[in-house]
């Protein structure tokens, strides 16, 4: 096992600035990819000096990844593949296919960052995972269809669902505003109620007194 200092966070291994022990083959990959340096005495000393800078850089990369995740969530991921009438694909959809789709949409996502929970060998809707950062994995919906006509129907269906969700949100917001305005326009004044009750009580007492004064004493 070799000790390396991680220059950036690696999922399942550690965060930027940490020292990790890995097999020689994996160490060569990390070194070549610029994700780590050898944990020599000099590098460890240098790490201690630059640790704050490394953590700041990692936070910056995480913020960028969160922005990419939000943007990806708005994309409609559709792959067209030939299939039989029952939906069985002539082949399968691979992580490379998804990586190419994302790259075509303007995202630099390598195949190693894509994963599926199941092998995609039929048309349908699937959840895929895209690792954008060691601390952030985006779960996306992938639609696999047999032709462009079906792809267009999927696009229209997604758009309709989004419109319905937006309309429902607007209605809910309007109802909340109306309820708040109604509550503001009819305040409950507890002091006024107490005052009215006290006045009413005094009126009743005075009336009772007047009635008593007006009664005649029975003659004997």
Swiss-Prot record:
InterPro entries, per database record: Ribosomal_bL9, Ribosomal_bL9/RNase_H1_N, Ribosomal_bL9_bac/chp, Ribosomal_bL9_C, Ribosomal_bL9_C_sf, Ribosomal_bL9_N, Ribosomal_bL9_N_sf
Pfam families: Ribosomal_L9_C, Ribosomal_L9_N
Biological process per Gene Ontology, one example term: translation
Keyword RNA-binding: yes
Keyword Manganese: no
Gene3D superfamilies per record: Ribosomal protein L9, C-terminal domain (3.10.430.100), Ribosomal protein L9, N-terminal domain (3.40.5.10)
Disordered, as annotated region: 167-220
Keywords carried by this UniProt record: Ribonucleoprotein, Ribosomal protein, RNA-binding, rRNA-binding
GO molecular function: rRNA binding; structural constituent of ribosome
Gene Ontology cellular-component annotations: ribonucleoprotein complex; ribosome
Biased composition (Low complexity): 167-184
Stated role: Binds to the 23S rRNA.
Family of this protein: Belongs to the bacterial ribosomal protein bL9 family.
Entry-linked HAMAP family: Ribosomal_bL9
Full protein name: Large ribosomal subunit protein bL9
């Amino acid at each position: 096992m070799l000790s390396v200092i991680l220059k950036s966070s690696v999922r399942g291994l550690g965060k930027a600035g940490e020292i990790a022990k890995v097999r020689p083959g994996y160490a060569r990959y990390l070194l070549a990819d610029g994700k780590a340096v050898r944990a020599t005495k000099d590098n460890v000393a240098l790490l201690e000096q630059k640790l704050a800078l490394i953590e700041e850089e990692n936070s910056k990369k995480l913020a960028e990844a969160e922005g990419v995740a939000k943007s990806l969530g708005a994309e409609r991921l559709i792959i067209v593949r030939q299939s039989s009438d029952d939906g069985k694909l002539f082949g399968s959809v691979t992580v490379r296919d998804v990586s190419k789709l994302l790259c075509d949409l303007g995202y630099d996502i390598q195949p190693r960052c894509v994963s599926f929970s199941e092998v995609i060998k039929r048309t349908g809707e699937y959840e895929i995972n895209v690792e954008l950062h060691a601390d952030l994995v985006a779960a996306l919906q992938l639609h696999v269809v047999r032709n462009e006509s079906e792809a267009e129907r999927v696009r229209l269906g997604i758009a309709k669902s989004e419109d319905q969700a937006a309309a429902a949100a607007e209605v809910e917001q309007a109802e909340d505003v109306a309820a708040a305005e109604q509550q503001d326009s009819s305040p409950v004044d507890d002091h006024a109620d107490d005052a009215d009750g006290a006045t009413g009580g005094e009126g009743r007492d005075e009336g009772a007194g007047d009635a008593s004064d007006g009664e005649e004493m029975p003659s004997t």
